[in-house]
Design a protein with these regions (language model features):
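Bacterial N-terminal signal peptides that target proteins for export
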Residues: 2-15
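Cys-His-centered catalytic/binding microenvironment captured across papain-like cysteine peptidases
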Residues: 198
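Beta-strand-dense domains in secreted/periplasmic systems and polymorphic toxin scaffolds
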Residues: 174, 205-209
């Protein structure tokens, strides 16, 4: 039972860590949506945005994960960098909590993200008419809602809604459920992905996920991004958490 539980945590968090990266919104949709009469004005503006991915960035990511039923929790602060050559690299600078999650989940997940950059897989999950159908949705938090329905079952696609700024159609949030369960053991994964304009580029700033696992119950995951540079422009000075002050700093299995 113990080895199975560890395997469930590992499989879940690797999936959650990879999912935010490939849920990058809208970058490839301009040509598809620019003059399509199927889409209302605001959605058409979003699909028509000429919004290429940033050519380079450096960010401090803060990762936290827990499962109360299995009494496991961990955290990690990681410097991540993406350069103009398309290379992704990372450096762990602070960590605490379950040594298993830190060594076998977080670090392996970073390697998974590195492989995703190299493989070009994000195109499978872009917010384009090829991947999704779109319909008018309910407003929330002063944002205009659009219902997004995947055109196929895929763990990289979200069945839910996107929320856009009403004045310009810029993407602020994606939320919903992964359209395909990552495995038999992971019954469902609900995810919220948040974006913000930084140095003119739309950048991910947070991802939160909750998963229901057979025999293990509810597991939670949160990752935030604090940027130091975007496209060569300095935008912040993030600092890692201190292991002496962090409540999860105590090493455990």
């Amino acid at each position: 039972m113990k080895s199975m539980s560890r395997g469930l945590i590992r499989g879940l968090l690797i999936t959650l860590f990879a999912a935010p990266f490939v849920l990058n919104g809208g970058n490839g949709a301009a040509a598809a949506g620019a003059a399509d009469p199927r889409f209302p004005g605001l959605l058409q503006r979003f699909l028509s945005l000429d919004d290429p991915s940033p050519s380079a960035y450096r960010a401090l990511r803060r990762l936290d994960a827990s499962n109360q039923n299995l009494n496991k929790a961990a955290w990690m602060d990681v410097w991540t960098e993406y350069d103009k050559s398309g290379m992704f690299k990372y450096s762990v600078v602070a960590e605490g909590g379950s040594s298993y999650i830190r060594s076998k989940v977080f670090r392996e997940s970073l390697e998974t993200e590195k492989r995703v950059y190299e493989s070009g897989a994000p195109s499978r999950a872009e917010l384009t008419p090829e991947n999704y159908s779109f319909a008018e949705g309910a407003a929330a938090d002063g944002l205009s809602g659009v219902v997004v329905t995947p055109r196929r079952k895929d763990i990289l696609l979200v069945d839910g809604s996107i929320f856009l700024k009403p004045e310009d159609g810029d993407l602020v949030r994606i939320e919903g459920r992964l359209s395909k369960a990552p495995s038999f053991w992971i019954r469902q994964v609900d995810i919220v992905r948040s974006y913000r304009r930084i140095a003119g580029a739309r950048m991910p700033v947070a991802v939160e996920a909750v998963a229901n696992i057979r025999l293990a119950g509810r597991a939670t995951f949160r990752m935030t991004y604090e940027y130091e540079t975007v496209n060569g422009r300095r935008v912040g000075a993030p600092e890692p958490r201190s292991t002496t002050n962090e409540s999860l700093a105590r090493s455990e299995p």
